[in-house]
């Protein structure tokens, strides 16, 4: 029963919006039932990424104006955590951020990578240094070590190596990538809010921010 209660996280992303981080915070409120352990938001302002991650509920961390002001930009992604893998600590709170030669990116991930330990051992053998104990960082290292040139191709290559049930929102300077496992086990929906595109774990989050549902 405990495993069932702890199998869900919530992810939310928006691109091309004037107040992206405020929209994400509101969306995460609607997804709070999916994870009460921690919450985080990363934004992109056209020049650099900004991140705020904290233990506890969305309301306790993102209802303060100064926090949202510290997350400027037209794109943002967020995460509420209820861990299935990895210890309960700030280093495992998402979104996780990484910087490559091809640019930086932030990842918000829901799900479990069933072959994560096998991949982690192989990556460590090849020289990767892990900073967290979450499955998400395994994906980041697979992206970093991919021989493909573009970030999109690196992610495609990385996800071909993972097994399990997952949904991902990846924010890059060029745009936002959203994907699900091949069987679509973990939920992810797409919506629009004016000119903005939104991805979320559940349609209730689209409803709360006033977005129109587009597809699953």
PLM features: residue spans?
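Conserved short alpha-helical segments that host acidic/polar catalytic motifs at enzyme active sites
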Residues: 1-216
């Amino acid at each position: 029963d405990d495993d069932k209660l702890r199998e869900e996280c919530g992810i939310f992303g928006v691109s091309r919006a004037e107040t992206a981080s405020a929209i994400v915070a509101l969306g995460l409120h609607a997804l709070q039932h999916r994870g009460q352990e921690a919450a985080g938001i990363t934004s992109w302002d056209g020049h650099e990424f900004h991140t705020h991650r904290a233990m506890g509920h969305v309301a306790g961390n993102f209802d303060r104006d100064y926090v949202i002001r510290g997350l400027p930009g037209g794109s943002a992604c967020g995460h509420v955590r209820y861990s299935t893998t990895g210890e309960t600590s700030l280093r495992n709170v998402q979104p996780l951020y990484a910087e490559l030669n091809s640019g930086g990116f932030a990842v918000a991930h829901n799900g479990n990578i069933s072959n994560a330990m096998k991949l982690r051992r192989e990556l460590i053998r090849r020289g990767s240094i892990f900073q967290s104990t979450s499955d998400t960082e395994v994906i980041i290292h697979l992206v970093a070590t991919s021989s493909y040139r573009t970030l999109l191709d690196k992610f495609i290559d990385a996800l071909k190596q993972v097994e399990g049930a997952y949904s991902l929102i990846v924010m890059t300077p060029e745009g936002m990538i959203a994907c699900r496992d091949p069987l679509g086990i973990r939920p992810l929906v797409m919506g629009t809010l004016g000119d903005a595109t939104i991805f979320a774990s559940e349609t209730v989050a689209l409803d709360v921010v006033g977005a129109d549902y587009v597809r699953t």
